Amino acid sequence: MNGEEEFFDAVTGFDSDNSSIGEFSEANKISGMIDLDTSKSTRSGKNGEKPQQENGIQKHRTALPAPMFTRSDFSVWSILKKCIGLELSKITMPIAFNEPLSFLQRITEYMEHVYLIHKASSQSQPLERMQSVAAFAVSAVASQWERTGKPFNPLLGETYELIREDLGFRFISEQVSHHPPISAFYSEGLNQDFRFHGSIYPKLKFWGKSVEAEPRGTITLELLKHNEAYTWTNPTCCVHNVILGQLWIEQYGIVEIVNHRTGDKCILHFKPCGLFGKELHRVEGYIQDKNRKKLFIMYGKWTECLWGIDPASYESFKKQEKRGDQARKAKMDDGPEKANSDVPGDVADDVPVAQETVQVIPGSKLLWRINSRPPNSAQMYNFTSFTVSLNELESGMEKTLPPTDCRLRPDIRGMENGNMDLASQEKERLEEKQREARKERAKEDAEWRTRWFSPGNNPYTGAPDWLYAGHYFERNFSDCPDIY
């Protein structure tokens, strides 16, 4: 896969944050702190003075430079009506439907709840570790809630790095193929307690009134202290009412997390909305051992929280609940069923009303709870506090970043600053520049060469994957391509 196909701005990234109580409180205190550079020797303040807080924990911005603009004057249908039946990765969308982030930065949002990985690494029992890993897998998609803007499709060779010394990890990603679009990422704990890596290439489908992103690619988490590896894929994400009405998102599908050392599995069911919206955002699942004996039950909402309880207590509660439901059902009549059509030109689907909270079963254990979003989130593309900081470009960072880092993309920067005309012009320029570069490689019969990842097979599943080749943080960027 050399990415030598024609350049298109793909509708990718509909694919992939959180406080809790007790032991999770420390994660909340540092949610606004970020460090983006390990090369402290190259960073300095005025007169060459070192910045304060040598541990790299710094307070970053809490708002974007400009508020989000209205999309009310733009019609998705005017574009999509010409493309029914086509591969969505080849549809050029106007910048009005973007959010000011690259898909590589969207992937980085997996790390907002990295404290759950650290917690798993510190736990002595495999069952407890699987609980924390499952909570991390659910939390990794939580930032997508109400995020209806499309991230910018990464250019071939684009990269993004993030170092959070306060959260104990560093992260690097690269766009390794353009068509099909494939984004590879690698993260590791600064204390060498974990490795987290994968490659993402969503399959997109247009269903008339909705766009569905089916995840492709394996996600792998290695807990080095325990010599354990966990693998899974993300649930399917669907954006409804792309033609008419209020946009809303749901995630659905089965996520199977495998512990390749013990044989334990966690099966998580991200439930579809259903006819009356009762199941919207709900997640249910269980952990089983290699003999398929259920060890633990989990339930919650990917937009809110995840709880767990032992199977016996769960079954007892469900039996009592069922008896109560049967008594209530005899007194209720839900009326005629609602028609469910997905034909272009029909009226918009009603946005289902989710139940406000999760009913907590007595004796349950809280595994994860989402962070509150900043009060101005709705004016910032519904970004979380973690997300708001991802594209911030600190003074002097250009000296340590490679020229391919997406913080340096002028179209994303223009949109973030509220200059939509500039952003659109730069987007078109970058697309044309990449087309010309592809043509030049074709003339010279030269294949694209990735810098930081190489194609291979996942060491645990055997599936095709892109593996981190190392050396990025040595910061030799002399042969990086000029893509901007």
UniProtKB/Swiss-Prot annotation:
Sequence positions bearing Phosphoserine: 19-20
Region of interest: Disordered: 35-61, 319-348, 423-454
UniProt biased composition (Basic and acidic residues): 319-340, 424-450
Residues given in the record as a 1,2-diacyl-sn-glycero-3-phospho-(1D-myo-inositol-4,5-bisphosphate) binding sites: 90, 178-179, 431-435
SUPFAM superfamilies (alphabetical): Oxysterol-binding protein-like (SSF144000)
Entry-linked InterPro entries: OSBP_sf, Oxysterol-bd, Oxysterol-bd_CS
Gene3D superfamilies from the UniProt entry: 2.40.160.120, 3.30.70.3490
Family the entry assigns: Belongs to the OSBP family.
Protein name: Oxysterol-binding protein-related protein 2
Naturally occurring in which organism (per UniProt): Mus musculus (Mouse)
